[in-house]
């Protein structure tokens, strides 16, 4: 039997007894710090609210706005407009087109080719742009226009492919039928002579597209489609749109501005044979250039005869006198919507002296912003197009493609002021003033009288049935698209449209 000592029993009992409670000194200290901190924080908050009430602290207001913003319901992001349903039709073939000329000539041609494709129930391939003309611009359609928008926005009219299917390409041995459509052709020509070609060839390539559709005599639905493509289907790329908008914004911040389409560029002078104001060396240089391009048909041109007929662009010196005579003041802001002026800044000196606030895109934008568009004349022309359309007043010094297309666009936007210079009359007046026959006051009065009805107001297109090249261009005045319904007499008045 095991015997335990008293001391051992006492030790065992003492191990089972609870220890007396210790004083929690660290916990008291923690609670004390917390109470003091709370008092301090509440004091600061009270002071902050008081300061906000007294001085409307922007910091506190911003904080409140942030809280409200996060607590308020989130506004849904607006969805893009729904796409029109695709038109369901049996395609008669594929139309491939190669546009020729500068940006605005190609723009009009694209509108015409979409319309032809719709008329003939064809599938259109996104048009190829001119890369071999004087400007040698390598830009493709996708470098200038928003391809996705072009295809989607017109899909209820025409089926458009990004590229020609491989089986129809020359690379795979397909012999494509090429042709230039007859200029100024009507609906009957395309239905009777062009449509049968697709039954035989499936793919037809139009290798020239300038002015291949008549100005007049087409069904109203086709004229409307030409306008729809021009005003809605053809959007510039987001990059071009952004830079063009920035240019317009800079100009508008400086006040109203005139967009002057000063078509005094080397290619135009060489093509037209207009050398008034040029030195003998410059005239010879322009003549040599004219002979360099075989597709420029006229070679021997008498400059002064051409000028007297009103067929030459005004010189910068002549423009200075005309603008002053029209009443534009010296502080008028003028944007030069053009490429390189022939003779450079030297030829602009008189115009700049008369109107010191002359600017160009190169003066308004950083060189880095323009760098990606340099050596791409069509992309630079797109910037000038956007500025010209947005200007308070547009004045072209020559009636080329840009002048005409911008004029029509400004009519579509509500007949914005566009001064269409009567160059034939102006040449007469300028010469009379130059030889002292007319005083300045007489000259100014005569210039204003000559342009009272040439500011872009509503009017009918002039129709010359047997001379379509001499009649008013559809895209300069798309009158069918500028009034509601099919009857435009209320807008234009009752007039005979032909002569």
UniProtKB/Swiss-Prot annotation:
Catalytic activity, as annotated: alpha-D-galacturonosyl-[(1->2)-alpha-L-rhamnosyl-(1->4)-alpha-D-galacturonosyl](n) + UDP-beta-L-rhamnose = [(1->2)-alpha-L-rhamnosyl-(1->4)-alpha-D-galacturonosyl](n+1) + UDP + H(+)
Domain of life the protein comes from: Eukaryota
Compartments, as annotated in UniProt: Golgi apparatus membrane
EC number assigned by the record: 2.4.1.351
Binding positions (substrate): 261-263
Entry GO terms, CC: Golgi membrane
CDD domains: O-FucT_plant
Pfam families linked to this entry: O-FucT
Pathway linked to the protein: Glycan metabolism; pectin biosynthesis
One GO BP annotation of this record: pectin biosynthetic process
EC class: transferase
Keywords: Carbohydrate metabolism, Cell wall biogenesis/degradation, Fucose metabolism, Glycoprotein, Glycosyltransferase, Golgi apparatus, Membrane, Signal-anchor, Transferase, Transmembrane, Transmembrane helix
Membrane topology: Single-pass type II membrane protein
Transmembrane segments: 31-50
Residues modified by glycosylation: 88, 121, 207, 375, 435, 496
GO molecular function, one term: glycosyltransferase activity
Family per record: Belongs to the glycosyltransferase GT106 family.
Cross-referenced PANTHER family: OS02G0726500 PROTEIN-RELATED, RHAMNOGALACTURONAN I RHAMNOSYLTRANSFERASE 1
Role noted for this protein: Glycosyltransferase involved in the formation of rhamnogalacturonan I (RG-I) oligosaccharides in the seed coat mucilage, which is a specialized cell wall with abundant RG-I. Transfers the rhamnose residue from UDP-beta-L-rhamnose to RG-I oligosaccharides.
Protein name per the record: Rhamnogalacturonan I rhamnosyltransferase 1
Protein species of origin: Arabidopsis thaliana
């Amino acid at each position: 039997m095991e015997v335990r000592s008293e001391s051992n029993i006492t030790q065992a009992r003492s191990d089972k007894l609870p220890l007396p409670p210790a004083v929690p000194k660290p916990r008291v200290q923690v609670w004390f710090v917390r109470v003091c901190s709370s008092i301090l924080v509440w004091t600061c908050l009270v002071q902050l609210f008081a300061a906000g009430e007294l001085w409307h602290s922007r910091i506190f207001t911003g904080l409140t706005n942030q809280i409200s913003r996060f607590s308020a319901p989130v506004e849904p992001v607006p969805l893009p407009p729904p796409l029109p349903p695709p038109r369901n039709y049996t395609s008669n073939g594929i139309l491939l087109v190669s546009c020729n000329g500068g940006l605005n000539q190609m723009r009009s041609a694209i509108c015409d080719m979409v319309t032809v494709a719709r008329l003939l129930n064809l599938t259109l391939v996104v048009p190829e742009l001119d890369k071999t003309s004087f400007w040698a611009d390598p830009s493709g359609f996708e470098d200038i226009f928003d391809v996705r928008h072009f295809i989607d926005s017109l899909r209820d009219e025409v089926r458009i492919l990004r590229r020609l299917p491989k089986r129809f390409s020359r690379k795979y041995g397909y012999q494509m039928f090429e042709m230039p459509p007859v200029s100024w052709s009507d609906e009957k020509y395309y239905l009777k002579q062009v449509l049968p070609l697709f039954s035989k060839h499936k793919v037809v390539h139009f290798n020239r597209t300038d002015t291949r559709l008549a100005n007049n005599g087409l069904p109203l639905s086709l004229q409307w489609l030409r306008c729809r493509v021009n005003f809605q289907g053809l959007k510039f790329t987001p990059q071009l749109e952004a830079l063009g908008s920035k240019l317009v914004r800079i100009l508008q911040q400086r006040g109203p501005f005139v967009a002057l389409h000063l078509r005094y560029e080397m290619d135009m002078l060489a093509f037209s044979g207009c050398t008034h104001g040029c030195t003998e060396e410059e005239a010879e240089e322009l003549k040599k250039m004219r002979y360099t391009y075989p597709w420029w048909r006229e070679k021997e041109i008498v400059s002064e005869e051409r000028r007297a007929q009103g067929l030459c662009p005004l010189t910068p010196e002549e423009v200075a006198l005309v603008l002053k005579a029209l009443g534009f003041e010296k502080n008028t802001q003028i944007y030069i919507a053009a490429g390189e002026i022939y003779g450079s800044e030297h030829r602009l000196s008189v115009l700049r002296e008369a109107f010191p606030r002359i600017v160009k895109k190169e003066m308004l934008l950083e060189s880095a912003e323009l760098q990606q568009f340099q050596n791409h004349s069509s992309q630079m022309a797109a910037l000038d197009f956007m500025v010209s359309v947005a200007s308070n007043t547009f004045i072209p010094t020559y009636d080329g493609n840009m002048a005409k297309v911008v004029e029509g666009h400004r009519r579509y936007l509500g007949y914005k002021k566009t001064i269409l210079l009567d160059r034939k009359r102006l040449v007469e007046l300028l010469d009379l003033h130059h030889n002292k026959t007319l005083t300045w006051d007489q000259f100014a009065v005569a210039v204003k009288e000559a342009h009272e009805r040439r500011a872009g107001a509503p009017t009918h297109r002039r129709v010359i049935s047997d001379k379509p090249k001499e009649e008013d261009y559809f895209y300069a005045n798309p009158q069918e698209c500028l009034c509601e319904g099919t009857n435009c007499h209320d807008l234009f008045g009752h007039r005979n449209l032909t002569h």
